[in-house]
Amino acid sequence: MDPIDAEIIKILQDDGRASNAGIESKLMVSEGTVRRRLKKLVEDEFIQIIALPDPRKMGYESQALLGVQVEPDKIGDVANNLSNLGEVNWVAITTGTYDVFAWVTLPSAEALGLFLRNDVGSIPGVRKTETFVNLDKMRGHAITI
């Protein structure tokens, strides 16, 4: 990745629907150059082109961060099991009090409770969970290039 690639990414972070022609005019390179570089950035997994819906507008009122304590020999398995659940947005294996964190989105507090008891609670190796319910989203963005 070079400075032109980084600039393409910055433009797309500001406007995910920016056209190749629009990017071309900002960077003073050909549209073909933008198209090739963008294709390579996606193929090499530097970026993903995705739509990020607003969960609340989609009817999902409950978001939470789950801290999960896991039996030491089951950390990878628990993380994989969590990542396969549709309600889970992302999973991270971490250091500290919790071995795994997962961000989840569900339609309601009741659905969150059922998810914790029925889905997370049934994963072998889970010792303890603590749920941090999101009350208000203050800011969210991708890394700045």
What is the predicted function of each stretch?
Residues 1-145:
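A compositional/biophysical signature of low hydrophobicity enriched in polar/charged and small residues
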